[in-house]
């Protein structure tokens, strides 16, 4: 069994950085080093007092120390890591662009008063969960050891649990919307038309190359990287420059996670 340090060092760079920032943001608020209100997304303060840091800091706050906070961190460690090590393997720039696009989408949605929420960290985590569920739709998930379901339905099951326990559901809904928009633009629409309008910008690739983040970008995506949507096949999210217009292989080839169960609280 690996030590906590070895496990941490084994994490892929973008997921590790995001999870670390989320953890220390909560630590800082719990120790009183910074008040949550000073990092919240408050449009009036952003526009009138130019407190533009709020556009970024709100994305790293998952709430105070609690069971829900622990679950969100586990979701990053489980689903974010599996995405970055799976369909985004050797595509660090594409994964970073996905996170940037998701963050931007959430910020735009928050401009609408109905969708506004002061912190979008949970929404960004939920976006990762949604994309993971589309990538590995046939993985078996055990919810607290009580119910087993296909991963394709996990975001909706988590949403239902928040409804039952009286937790806010808007962050979950925002994450689903942002995740589906990214999935539509990088998988569904390219499969239908052969055109990908959300390729990873060159400046993102330059950042990754300049700072030597992650593995070098693969010139060609591995076969089976782009899959069909829906519970019948594991789609390949991420429409970076390495996007292939070929359709996914038959369902029988997408069996990497079929038959394996994961407990949410493991």
Curated annotation (Swiss-Prot):
It is found in: Endoplasmic reticulum membrane. GO terms for biological process: response to stress. It is a multi-pass membrane protein. Residues 235-266 are annotated as: Disordered. Pfam families: DER1. The chain crosses the membrane at residues 21-41, 56-76, 95-115, 157-177. GO terms for cellular component: endoplasmic reticulum membrane; plasma membrane. PANTHER family: DER1-LIKE PROTEIN, DERLIN (PTHR11009). It comes from the Eukaryota. May be involved in the degradation process of specific misfolded endoplasmic reticulum (ER) luminal proteins. Keywords: Endoplasmic reticulum, Membrane, Transmembrane, Transmembrane helix. Residues 42-55, 116-156 are lumenal. The keyword Transmembrane applies. Residues 1-20, 77-94, 178-266 are cytoplasmic. This is Derlin-1. Belongs to the derlin family. InterPro entries: DER1, Rhomboid-like_sf. Disulfide bonds: none annotated. It comes from Arabidopsis thaliana (Mouse-ear cress). The keyword Nucleotide-binding does not apply.
């Amino acid at each position: 069994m690996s030590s906590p340090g070895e496990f941490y060092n084994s994490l892929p760079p973008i997921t590790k950085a995001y999870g670390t920032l989320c953890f220390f943001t909560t630590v800082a608020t719990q120790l009183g080093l910074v008040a949550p209100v000073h990092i919240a997304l408050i449009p009036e303060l952003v526009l009138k007092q130019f407190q533009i840091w709020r556009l970024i800091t709100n994305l790293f706050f998952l709430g105070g120390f609690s069971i829900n906070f622990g679950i969100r961190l586990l979701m990053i460690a489980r689903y974010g890591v599996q995405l970055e090590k799976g369909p985004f393997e050797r595509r660090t720039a594409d994964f970073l662009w996905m996170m940037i696009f998701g963050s931007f989408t959430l910020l735009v949605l928050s401009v609408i008063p109905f969708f506004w929420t002061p912190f979008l960290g949970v929404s960004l985590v939920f976006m990762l969960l949604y994309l993971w569920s589309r990538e590995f739709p046939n993985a078996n998930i055990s919810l607290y050891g009580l119910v087993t379901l296909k991963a394709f339905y996990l975001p909706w099951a988590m949403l239902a649990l928040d409804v039952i326990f009286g937790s806010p559901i808007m962050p979950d809904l925002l994450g689903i919307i942002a995740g589906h928009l990214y999935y539509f633009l990088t998988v569904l629409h390219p499969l239908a038309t052969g055109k990908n309008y959300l390729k990873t910008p060159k400046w993102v690739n330059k950042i990754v190359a300049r700072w030597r983040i992650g593995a070098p970008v693969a010139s060609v995506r591995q076969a089976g990287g782009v899959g069909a949507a829906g519970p019948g096949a594991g789609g390949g999210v991420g429409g970076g420059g390495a996007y292939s217009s070929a359709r996914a292989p038959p369902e029988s080839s997408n069996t990497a996670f079929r038959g394996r169960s994961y407990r949410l609280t493991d």
